[in-house]
From Swiss-Prot:
Protein name: Immunoglobulin lambda-1 light chain
Cited Gene3D superfamilies: Immunoglobulins
Residues of the Ig-like domain: 1-108, 117-211
Keyword Disulfide bond carried by entry: yes
Modified residues (Pyrrolidone carboxylic acid): 1
Length: 216
């Protein structure tokens, strides 16, 4: 009972088609018309998109279709959309109430439209200041492609110490999100007129500023 073989990755441009193969043996894929396909977005549970080789559950668009020839089953996704970017797994019955699963294929959708980030800057909370800490949080969301650079400034001058920025992660809408944190002492926070988080994405810059005087 070894895993069914799938290509590790596949890609296609928006609107195009992509086909994923799932190769087994005459004891599983070739022997039964019980091949299913699952779609799994990052951090989410898998969802059945095809069962019994070529049947679609209600709610699954007809852009998804399945077929089988000999010991190989195939899933075709036509008219690719951004939300089709996910991992896809096949499975097949192999007798004696057993099922065997595929190795999985990561599908990348190319040519998605650029989306500029939404940036929100939060000052330290009063509770945190009372605990003798001060953290500024810069939330960056809804951007594509998934790369940004973040710079912090105090009164317009660059700040490098105490900065931590997360790696962008994919949101459920297929755009990306990241966070950047600036750790200060309450004295540092109160000794400047303003702090800024500057986010650069695809050559464009968004800057958000907070001032200690606005928050007691």
């Amino acid at each position: 009972q070894s895993a069914l073989t799938q290509p590790p990755s596949a890609s296609g441009s928006l609107g195009q088609s992509v086909t994923i193969s799932c190769t087994g043996t005459s004891s599983d894929v070739g022997g039964y018309n019980y091949v299913s396909w699952y779609q799994q977005h990052a951090g989410k549970a898998p969802k059945v998109i095809i069962y019994e080789v070529n049947k679609r559950p209600s709610g699954v668009p007809d852009r998804f279709s399945g077929s089988k020839s000999g010991n190989t089953a195939s899933l075709t996704v036509s008219g690719l959309q951004a939300e089709d970017e996910a991992d896809y797994y096949c499975s097949s019955y192999e007798g004696s109430d057993n099922f065997v699963f595929g190795t999985g294929t990561k599908v990348t959708v190319l040519g998605q439209p650029k989306a500029n980030p939404t940036v929100t800057l939060f000052p330290p909370s009063s509770e945190e200041l009372q605990a003798n800490k001060a953290t500024l949080v810069c939330l960056i969301s809804d951007f594509y492609p998934g790369a940004v650079t973040v710079a912090w400034k105090a009164d317009g001058s660059p700040v490098k110490a105490g900065v931590e920025t997360t790696k962008p992660s994919k949101q459920s809408n297929n755009k990306y999100a990241a966070s950047s944190y600036l750790s200060l002492t309450p004295e540092q926070w109160k000794s400047h007129r303003s702090y800024s988080c500057q986010v650069t994405h695809e050559g464009s810059t968004v800057e958000k500023t907070v001032a200690p005087t606005e928050c007691s």
